[in-house]
Structures are given as C-alpha cells and as structure tokens.
Amino acid sequence: MAVPGVGLLTRLNLCARRRTRVQRPIVRLLSCPGTVAKDLRRDEQPSGSVETGFEDKIPKRRFSEMQNERREQAQRTVLIHCPEKISENKFLKYLSQFGPINNHFFYESFGLYAVVEFCQKESIGSLQNGTHTPSTAMETAIPFRSRFFNLKLKNQTSERSRVRSSNQLPRSNKQLFELLCYAESIDDQLNTLLKEFQLTEENTKLRYLTCSLIEDMAAAYFPDCIVRPFGSSVNTFGKLGCDLDMFLDLDETRNLSAHKISGNFLMEFQVKNVPSERIATQKILSVLGECLDHFGPGCVGVQKILNARCPLVRFSHQASGFQCDLTTNNRIALTSSELLYIYGALDSRVRALVFSVRCWARAHSLTSSIPGAWITNFSLTMMVIFFLQRRSPPILPTLDSLKTLADAEDKCVIEGNNCTFVRDLSRIKPSQNTETLELLLKEFFEYFGNFAFDKNSINIRQGREQNKPDSSPLYIQNPFETSLNISKNVSQSQLQKFVDLARESAWILQQEDTDRPSISSNRPWGLVSLLLPSAPNRKSFTKKKSNKFAIETVKNLLESLKGNRTENFTKTSGKRTISTQT
C-alpha cells in the first residue's frame, strides 16, 4: 500500500535543511522510584548513529530468553481504561495499595489507557479482589474476571490534569520527510527511518500483554496453554501499527500429560478424538472465536476463518488498537521469527536496510495490506538477507553455516522439517564488511534490477543463486519448509514493476553521487527522492533507457539482415521495452 500523502512532497517545501531541528513528540515511560527506563525514549537516541543508537534495542541474548522474560513481565501487568483527566500521582497511590509498581505508561486508543506492571504477580489478585462487576439498569453484564479494568472517578470535577501518553503510531508523512531531509547523509536517513518506524518498548510490552490477556481466556479451556506472539511483533523488523500475530501453543499441555510410569499402571486422560489434526485445529479455534466474541473484553469484529490453508481467528483488540490473527501450534512461524531476530541482531545495518526497502516498496504500491499478487514484506526481508549474504565479505551468514555452529541443544525438527541453527549469538563471528548503508542500498537496487528472475531462485539457506524448480515469476525458497515458495503469489507484472523501480532507484542514487543538492537547496534528495511518485522526468528516464536498449537490439538485427525490409523493421522496433533480465 502506498504511503498516504506521499504526493504532498511535489507541492510542499519540505526539504530545505533547517537550522533548527524538527520538534519531536514526547514519548516517555513513567517509572516508579528506583526503576531505570533507559531504553524507552526514542527521542534521546542520536539520529545518525547505528552503533550507539540502536545496539541496545537488540540485546545480545537468546530469543527464547527474551520471550520468556517478556511473557513473565506481561503476567504481572494489568490494562486499565482511565478517565480522560486523571491525576497521575493519585492514580499510582491508589494502585500501590495492592502492591509495589515496577513501571507504567499511558497511551490512547479509543480512550486513555494505562499499562501498569506490578513487581509481584500476587498484586493482581489483590486488585481483582477489590474490583466489582458493573451493573446498569438497561443491560446485563456478563461476569468475567480478567486483568482488563475500567477506572471511574466518583468526583469527575476534582481532576483537571491530563497525563502525557506514549505514541503508538509512526509520524505523519510530512513530519517523517522533514526529518529525512534534515539528515546529514543517506546513512543518517536510513537510521532515522528505522528509529521512527521500529516498535517502541511500550508498544512491545502492549503486544505481549495483549497475548497474555488472550491466554487467560484460552486457559479456561486448555490449562497450561501459552499464547505466543510471532512474526513482526517479535522478530525486530516490526513497524509501529503492524498487526499482531499470535498462536495457541498446546505443547506445554501435551508435555504435562507425558506418560509417567509407576509400576504396572498407566494413567491417561479421557479425551475426544477427531479424524485429523486440521479438524482438531478448526474445532479449537471455533470455540476460542466464540469465547472472544461473546466474553472477551475489548475484542470486536471476530471472524473465524477456518477453511483457510492455515485456519485462524481474526479480531480487533480495541483497547490496544491491534488487529490480531490467532492460529494454533504454528511453531515453524515462530522459528522463522527467531531466525530473523538473530539476523537483525548480528549487524546493525540489517534492520535499517530492511525498513528502508519496505518503505520504498510501500511508497510505490509494490506491497499491500490486501492479499493478492503483490510482493510481501517477508519476501522483501528475505531478499535483503540474501543480498547481504552475497556481499564480499558477507555481512550475514547463510542458514547452513548457522546450522554447522549448532550444538545438541539447538537441534530442532518440526513436522519433519529440519529447523536446526545456532541460537547463541555469541558463537557467531561478526562480519568484517564495512560498507556504508548508502552503498548497500544502491547495490541492492542494482543487484535485483539485474537479477535473472526468469532462471534463478533466492535461497538464504545456501546463500547462492539456484535454478528455479518451477515457473513462478519470483521464487524465494522457504528457509525451513524447503519445498515451498514464499513468493508464489507474485505475478509477472508485479515482479516487472519491482525490477523497473529497482533500476530507476539505482540510477537516482547514482546521480546523488555526482549531483547532491546543496544545504540551501529545497530539492528532495537521497532516500526521500526514492519515495517520490514517478515524476515526468523520471518517466522519461525509463523511456530513454528502454529506447536505448531497443536501438542496440535493432542495430544488431540490422547487421544480420539484408534486403528492403530492413528500413520498415527499424521504424517499428522502437517500442520494445526492457525485459526482466539485462
């Protein structure tokens, strides 16, 4: 989907580099005394430094450790719908009677909400015991005990102050482009884009809390189950405003029921059986969908999409503002998230390049939120990883090389698919490649603008081009389910559009090397120029490139042809366009 309002750049004078910095919105975490919230204010990070500005965003720890820590944190957290005007100090004082508070923040989504993390899980029980079910004269409330509360004031007029809330959405396009035009270099632009689009600490906490609230409901049917987030919410490539993908993990329930042999007796649970795992999945999701629809506070627009290849329940969690997709036992997707988490943590340039390529694709409608023949963000991410594996020296290791570093603890086979790779980041040697982001962005467009898509596939497991196993226009091998093509949906016309835009973008960046605008110029430059809609002069560039290619083709044909038909052929051959290959 194209960036809304991106066309405003053709009319607004946004790119004059200001002497005064653009004012950034306040984004903060409110912490109780003694709590350090060092990594939560985006505006305190230097906009041009990947090394110091973003390294602490990707901790050098295992994915499983991060997941467990976040989940435990979410279990000690409550979500409270608050009045618009509320005294923050009185609010905290009231909640502190139930137990010490670790930290909290406010945000807005169909009202004002507070996310409050207690130091101990037992404090939530105390708060629930002091809470009552609302009653109205006209309607009957369905009693449901959860960690989602509604706070009312007995005296509305006594509170006059407003709390400052954290930002859960990216900046407007105008603000973003002003920041990008102010940057000192293209590298600085890519880093700024990353900082503005990446998930904040607050947003990440809210995502895990939402999963934890859904888990509470699912646990009524399946004790010891876990609702795990996966995809962009956890792989460090998520953008503010992205959907929340989650799956119901029943493996813990199965593990608890593992056979425990005691003498001659073997005890089993009485269960119901169904013909296949797919039918079991459909029945489980059907029940959970009904539960969310009828009893889930804040869950609206529930859709049970049970006949899809991967059955799911889709709903909006109104309180958090997230569009959610719930599946079951999707462990391969979680493993893919872990792999991307590792790649994003290995080199600070990876995420900056991925975010910029995705933004570029969205600005030119190469990607869309609507399913169809478009390239997906996941496919673009795989293409960036593959490109970085192909650099000399490589910036990222291949999946096969990560597999060779794995030990017995890392061994993982899911549904017959080998998903083994090293999980310990400290065992992976950092790259010796020192190329700039500006060079990598330009080389990315040149590489895929000239890639032999008609013959070769993209394979991050081996990090090299391979012959395509079928005739799909774009073939990107699934890293774990290796017989699948993750880009099978992409049409030839969409691929050709990608190639044409990649070539054009490479040319624009090449021109930046020789014709970079002065500080006083108001002309869009660098990354901003790549996000502009095609202008007449840029269309003429594409046409000139096409004509040049056609002229060279005709010239070669003329040399091999004889007779009076040569002249007539010359007049009609100029319409030929650039093919996918060069």
From Swiss-Prot:
Q: Which GO terms describe its cellular component?
A: intracellular membrane-bounded organelle; mitochondrion; nucleoplasm
* Transit peptide stretch: 1-37
Entry's localization field: Cytoplasm; Mitochondrion
Residue numbers binding ATP: Y107, E108, S109, G241, C242
| Reactions performed catalytically | RNA(n) + ATP = RNA(n)-3'-adenine ribonucleotide + diphosphate
Q: What class of enzyme is it?
A: transferase
Effect seen on changing F378A: Reduced enzyme activity
Q: Which residues carry this modification: N6-acetyllysine?
A: K90
- By its UniProt entry, which Pfam families does this protein fall under? MTPAP-like_central (PF22600), PAP_assoc (PF03828), RL (PF17797)
So which cofactors does this thing need? Mg(2+); Mn(2+)
Residues that hold Mg(2+) according to the record? D243, D245
* Function text: Polymerase that creates the 3' poly(A) tail of mitochondrial transcripts. Can use all four nucleotides, but has higher activity with ATP and UTP (in vitro). Plays a role in replication-dependent histone mRNA degradation. May be involved in the terminal uridylation of mature histone mRNAs before their degradation is initiated. Might be responsible for the creation of some UAA stop codons which are not encoded in mtDNA.
Which PANTHER family did the record assign? POLY A POLYMERASE CID PAP -RELATED, POLY(A) RNA POLYMERASE, MITOCHONDRIAL
* Full protein name: Poly(A) RNA polymerase, mitochondrial
Q: Which organism is it from?
A: Homo sapiens
Its gene name is MTPAP
